[in-house]
Amino acid sequence: MAKRQLGLGKAAKAKKQKTETSQSTAATSQKPNETLRVELNEEADADDELAQLQALWNTYSKSDKENELMVNGIIHECDRLLRNWDEKNEALPDYFHAIYALALSELAKYKPEETSQCFQMALERLDAGLAAYPKSIDVNFAKSRVLLARIPLQYISTLEVSSQVGDYPNVSEMLDEALSVYEVAETEAEARKEYSKFNEDNLDILQALDDVLDMMDNFCKKEEEEDEEKEDDDDEEEDEEEEVIQLAENHPLYHIQATDKYNFWWRNHTLKFLTNVTKRTENTTQLQRELCTRLGQSYLQEAEVPANVYTTLKYDDDYAGLGELQGLQMEEGQKLAQESFKEALKYLKKAQDDDDPDTWVNVAEAMISLGNMYEMDSPDQEKWYDEAEKILVRANKATQGKYREILENLRGEDEGDE
């Protein structure tokens, strides 16, 4: 799999620290009207404190996760429940430990000066949960999420281009640990046939991995952009010719950037996630579409390098006579790109929504890219172009001309009336 050049999801963004805090967060569960209304599951007991905690966490996890007040409320409620259960000498359920730890890790976003402490407390809570429930699906999924969240906030944010392995923890080992714990939860959920665990909330773990890999892939680019902003306009032409900064082999992120191991892991486990989602009894159409979209995008990005090799060696006179580029011969690049584009199409077609023309256009654009991997004006190329055109005409009509430009480009027209 080619290294991701664009990323599959949104690049991880630093969260703005809230400037206003409440002095009454401990009373969150007692004064819900001061925060928000929490909806309980129909089967949940309104007098069940643990059910209320679950509902509060579910409300937060489905929100934009920008509510420090709610996070503090969840943590205070967990503290209270923990004291009460200790007094009763009763064991709390596994999901309690997961919620408590996740809330502590979320707090790290709002209190950057306490990042290390927040993650340490979160991991200690998870270890306590695993001591009581070694094979808990919820606790293991939560631990994977916390370990992934810690990497950018506690470690990558402190790195510079000049950083060396000996001065920082081994980021690769931390990443491996997070993925290993995820696999424990995944395997256990499959073994118990608890397919409901493969839901939107736990899909966030795979998205978190994608964001972390994105951050690592773009680490040097960020440094370069910051440097360029400080330079004069006179150096603009020179800047454009500069190559992306290469990390030294002793940099903490070097080996992660240099391998496709984690990209393959992401795809393989996203495929597993999709397989398990299809086994759920309830309607999961939207979740399946989301997964298929992500998988389709990953194959599109996998095709980028071989496609560029093929088109460059085939059509760029500056490379005339060159036998290979980036380790690939022209025919090899063509074949690999065709295979990846076809795989992308398989998933993008499954991701189509009759009410969302953008999803149709994703398919059409993949068809055009695939057509570009065939000889000019060949039957194969015309076949893919024709199919793409039909889709674009439909999408253009449905959106009153939104895709007119791409349709004209495909037709080679200056104007279009569709």
Curated annotation (Swiss-Prot):
Q: Does the keyword Cell wall biogenesis/degradation apply?
A: no
Regions of biased composition (Low complexity) lie at 1-11, 21-30
List localization entries: Nucleus
Q: Which GO terms describe its biological process?
A: positive regulation of SREBP signaling pathway; regulation of translation
- Could you tell me which residues belong to the region Disordered? 1-36, 222-241
Write down any Gene Ontology CC term. Answer: nucleus
Query: Which residue ranges have biased composition labelled Acidic residues?
Result: 224-241
* Keywords from the UniProt entry: Nucleus, Transcription, Transcription regulation, Translation regulation
Transmembrane segment boundaries = none
* Residues spanning the signal sequence: none
Q: Which family does it belong to?
A: Belongs to the ETT1 family.
Q: What is the annotated role of this protein in its UniProt record?
A: Required for correct translation termination and probably involved in regulation of hypoxic gene expression.
- Its name, as the record gives it, is Enhancer of translation termination 1
